[in-house]
Regions:
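Extracellular/lumen-exposed scaffold segments
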Residues: 379, 591, 608-768
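Replace the tail clause
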Residues: 2-447, 451, 457, 595-634
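Glycine-rich, acidic and aromatic/proline-enriched surface loops and short helix-turn segments
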Residues: 252-259, 470-478
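Extended, hydrophobic alpha-helical segments in both membrane/secreted and soluble proteins
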Residues: 68-75, 266, 287-290, 294, ...
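Long, polar/charge-rich, low-hydrophobicity segments
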Residues: 319-322, 477, 482-504, 510-645
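Short linear capping/connector segments at secondary-structure termini
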Residues: 268-274, 331-335, 485-495, 549-554, ...
């Protein structure tokens, strides 16, 4: 394979934005905010479509393809450096047919050509995508991501020279790249039995990547990856290491600058390992998924800070991403006035002035300490070194610890913070604001709908469920065609391209989340209708689900991408829909469909569960509810639900540092069953134990007298029928968050033992 230009650069320069009164190109006829940003470029841009393809074929020119999105920082940089530059435009217009694609409107095109970039650059990817295509088949010749002016002109010259002198070699290379893409995105693999170890394998893979000090499952940059925490919470929550990993990660994320401390909502990712300095764009799909994640974490832990994150994020979405029609907008830009994060950054003087203006001068010291501003600046724009250093706001400690520091209850502390944030937000709103991409995307709305519904159900806020229904009804009425097909996008009263599998699957996910929250039958009925339409359009028996409809002439491959990214794979989403429809309807047709879906990605599930954790989470649900449908080897334990009912009194216990209190834990066994005692007398049996998740909480257990019995010819000590265990809790020092206690036991009868169980003691320990 031959190559063209050298390494891509990552330099930046500012050039004046084009005059809005200058002549417009063909992009002015589109509705995409991203394409409309380029309508005044001197480049003769075409939108993706037959007009562009025919022009390239008739003129015998390669196609230059640029793929990006409206809130992409480096897309803006390349526009300023290249596409607004007349010299670059002259080259593009003379030797190429230039095509612009909004990746959010056409995820199918983005998937194909991002794979091409990763193949060409040996794994590197990102936006903008900059590729040259052979015009007859639309196969990629060469390309990369961001190119500055000099290298871009050099690359265009090399492509043009090769096109004239050796087009045969170019076509050969295009075919080779395309074959590799087809092998990666459309390969049909042989079905193999699902191993029951995929959950353990996925869990251990995540825990091996866990950052004990800072939270998260990678080094820098750190992405939120809500599906990681969701997987751990749903499949392995009884594991103490899992609980610590999830809580540390969720705490670190909302305490850092990646969370908008003043306005709520999460930025795209953290540029560092500390979750401190974000890439400042905000995406609907991140916030929709993270609302569900934090709501679920609140449900499992009772931690009030997670509820606060949910409330603040939904307030942000209501305020800044809600469309008057009923749906949700897509995203907000990373930059303001060509400066990344300008709207969100603060200097000490600005904070003082904002609070003084709100008659809150007495809160200045508190605020500077709260958000780390009194420790000096922490942000220097890497692209504009001439700008003075400033501050990304972050929490200097966990809110529970800070509340204790100020001798406040958590609600009192949060009310104090809310008042400060309101004053800062009032001033911030007077600044120039990042651009909002105001198109409505069905798939992303599905995730946000689920976020509202999940939060409303868990936190018992019916208004959130109603907001989810409002968005769902808008899509079902305005973005659904008479033939039953969905539209992918909507903007200013106009629909865009038809939807893809991810749109159907995600919207069904949202509808079923509403149904789980309020049992609205219409939501369930609409979900069933959409599922049948999706099955008609995207499913092929014996092959699985495809991302696109068949017969698309502008695609040289019909993709079926299985791995999760920032958004779960469409196949993973549809599997979850099948499992939920099975649960809600009892119709075994959905079970059969789910098993076929699992078969289609069985090799991925067994070999790389970390890449398909969303699917693995749903497989785990089916393994538990329908173990007979999976061909795993029987293990040495009896397959049976728990025989033990655990209760605790009091249900809620309040503790302060240095205090002690006692809870009573009661285990009631089914008739004929017992649990092994705390000392079993047999090395092959699992003893009953209780463990504090927080080292600051010390347990003193008053073990009752056990019974002796003979099992397998050997003595073993057990607790039978009912056992009551007093446990004294000693809080050594102030800790952050509420605390939990884990119980572990093994149930046995005269013939067999069950697998060991780990469950949370149903007592809530509230740290005052």
């Amino acid at each position: 394979m031959f190559s063209f230009a050298g390494e891509q650069d990552s330099i930046s320069s500012d050039q004046p934005t084009e005059d809005p009164d200058s002549p417009r190109n063909r992009l002015s006829e589109t509705t995409s905010p991203y394409l409309l940003q380029h309508q005044h470029n001197p480049v003769h841009w075409y939108p993706w479509g037959e007009e562009a393809f025919e022009a390239a074929r008739e003129q015998n020119k390669p196609i230059f393809l640029s793929i990006g999105y409206s809130t992409c920082y480096w897309c803006h940089v390349m526009e300023r450096e290249c596409f607004e530059d007349q010299e670059v435009a002259d080259w593009m217009n003379k030797f190429f047919i230039s095509v612009k694609v909004d990746r959010e409107e056409r995820p199918d095109i983005d998937e194909i050509y991002m794979t091409a970039v990763q193949l060409i650059t040996r794994g590197r990817g990102g936006w903008p995508i900059s590729l040259f295509l052979e015009p007859e088949t639309l196969k990629p010749i060469w390309g990369g991501t961001y190119f500055p002016k000099g290298r871009f002109i050099s690359l265009m010259k090399q492509i043009q020279d090769k096109w004239v002198s050796d087009v045969k070699a170019i076509l050969t290379q295009a075919n080779q790249i395309a074959d590799a893409i087809v092998g990666r995105l459309s390969l049909i693999q042989e079905t193999i039995p699902i191993s029951p170890e995929i959950i353990e394998k996925g869990t251990s893979s995540l825990l091996s990547r866990f950052d004990d000090n800072l939270g998260g499952f990678s080094g820098s940059p750190k992405f939120p990856m809500p599906m990681y925490n969701d997987f751990l919470m749903e499949t392995s929550w009884d594991n103490l290491q899992v609980q610590k990993a999830v809580k540390k990660t969720l705490d670190s994320m909302f305490m850092g600058g990646m969370y908008d401390q003043v306005g709520g909502g999460f930025h795209r990712y953290s540029t560092d390992a500390k979750w401190l300095v974000p890439h400042f764009e905000k995406m609907l799909y991140d916030n929709g998924q993270l609302v569900s994640t934090y709501a679920r974490a609140y449900e499992l832990t009772g931690e009030p800070t997670y509820a606060t994150v949910v409330e603040e994020t939904l307030e942000y979405v209501n305020r800044e991403l809600s469309a008057s029609e009923g749906g949700f907008y897509s995203a907000q830009d990373a930059e303001t006035n060509h400066l990344e994060g300008e709207t969100y950054l603060w200097r000490e003087l600005q904070i003082r002035e904002a609070l003084e203006e709100a008659d809150m001068a007495n809160e200045v010291s508190f605020t500077l300490s709260l958000y780390g501003v009194d420790g000096g600046t922490n942000f220097q724009d890497p692209h504009h070194k001439e700008e003075a250093p400033t501050n990304v706001l972050f929490l200097t400690n966990h809110p529970n610890v800070l509340a204790s520091k100020y001798k406040l209850s958590y609600p009192e502390f949060q009310a104090k913070v809310d008042a400060v944030d309101k004053a800062l937000l009032t001033v911030r709103d007077t600044r120039d604001q990042p651009t909002t991409d105001d198109k409505i995307i069905t798939a992303w709305n599905g995730m946000m709908i689920a976020g509202y519904a999940d939060a409303g159900r868990i936190m018992q806020n019916n208004s959130w469920v109603e907001r989810a229904m409002e968005a769902a009804n808008f899509i079902l009425s305005d973005m659904k065609l008479e033939n039953g097909k969905l539209l992918r996008t909507w903007r200013e009263g106009k629909g865009g391209a038809e939807a893809f599998l991810i749109d159907y699957a995600s919207l069904i996910h949202g509808l079923l989340a509403i149904y789980r929250a309020n049992e609205n039958k219409k939501m369930l009925e609409d979900a069933i209708v959409l599922y049948e339409k999706a099955r008609e359009l995207f499913y092929v028996s014996g092959e699985g689900w495809y991302d696109t409809e068949k017969g698309k002439s502008d695609l040289f491959v019909r993709t079926r991408a299985l791995s999760d990214g920032a958004i779960p794979a469409a196949t993973s989403f549809i599997l979850g829909d099948q499992v939920n429809l099975l649960e809600f309807t009892g119709d075994n047709t959905y079970l059969e469909d789910a098993l076929e879906t699992i078969n289609s990605e069985s090799q991925w599930l067994n070999a790389q569960p970390l890449a398909v954790l969303v699917a693995a989470k749903h497989v785990d649900r089916l393994m538990k509810s329908h173990p007979d449908k999976f061909g795993s080897e029987p293990n040495s334990f009896v397959e049976k639900d728990s025989t033990v009912n655990m209760s605790c009194e009091p249900k809620t216990l309040e503790l302060s540092a240095g205090e002690s209190a006692t809870i009573i834990v009661t285990l009631e066994m089914e008739r004929g069953w017992h649990v092994n005692a705390n000392v079993t007398g047999n090395e092959y049996t699992i003893p009953l134990s209780f463990t504090s998740i927080d080292d600051n909480l010390v347990l003193e257990i008053d073990w009752p007298k056990s019974e002796q019995m003979i099992s397998g010819g050997e003595k073993v000590y057990v607790f039978g029928s009912t056992v009551t265990i007093p446990i004294t809790l000693n809080l050594k020092q102030q800790s952050k968050g509420n605390m939990s206690i884990m119980a572990r036991w093994q149930s046995c009868n005269e013939k067999a033992c069950l697998a060991p169980e780990e469950k949370m003691v149903p007592c809530r320990v509230v740290v005052e």
